[in-house]
Amino acid sequence: DSLAKDSNAAPAISSAQLIAGGDKYVAEFDSTTVTGFLKAYKVKDDGDFEASPTWEAGAKLLETGSNARKIITNYGNGTSAGVAFRWDSLPADYQTQVQTGGAITVSAANAPKVVAYVRGDQSLEGLNGLRQRDGSLLGPIVNGTPWIQGPPSAEIYGSTGYADFFAKNKARQRVLWVPANDGMLHAFNVTTGEELFAYVPGALANRLVEIPLQRGTTARTKLAGANFTSGATENQPTGTVWPYVDGNPFTADVKVTSGADSVWRTYLLGTLGRGGKAVYALDVSMSADPLTTDPAVSYLSESNAASIFKWQFTSDDDADLGY
């Protein structure tokens, strides 16, 4: 395979795994099709794991309409930086970054199609279109390791305000966070494999156009004529898996205000890894909601984008920030 600078040089099929709570979660990728797979296996009575997975998240995403998915992004920092990842919801400057901000530019008519493709719209795929995603909508999971977010820990129970936070959140569901090189950090239901939510780091805005143009060794990407891109044409080498959200996420309980009325939240911290020079933070507290037995469904939503996204720190903030 031809491998480009900053690409992920890896075998055609590779995998990493996480074992937690009697389940095994295996993340795989296939560079020949530029796709990823996330499989869950149940433990058997003899302590070994079932041979067949309970669910596979990439295939489940194919069953979910792109419009139904809950995906957010951000433009810069600030209290209103978090927005829904839908073309009409993006600030004008973000739209400009998608269209002309990177090495590959697209027309004003095609820029919204980039966002639609990343969201999972498959209408542009085909022999005369963009890269086909036949078996999975999940991107390659290469260097990033899945992370399970559980209820708050009792280890800091004595800290001011934490007892109340613990009581409100001790029954919250576990969430499986997975970074993927489809430009997203995904949140999955650990029991069903359904996607609960996804986040597209705003630092990737000017590179999103690359995602539908990647080719696997099956060479199934053919540009829609010569009109999808303007200026530079497709330049991703065959068989290359380019990194986007390629770093490890983790969650921790954080005291966001001090004093007698201390407030605690659960934050997720993540990086782009080899995908770029950026660190981000999300508020994923998912406090119990009396209106639903599934708090992740009610809190992790596009309407809460401004509350979920907290901040990003990139090489624009500090030139010494590395990969």
Question: Where are the model-predicted features located?
Answer:
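A fold-level detector for beta-propeller and closely related beta-sheet-rich head/sensor domains
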Residues: 1-323
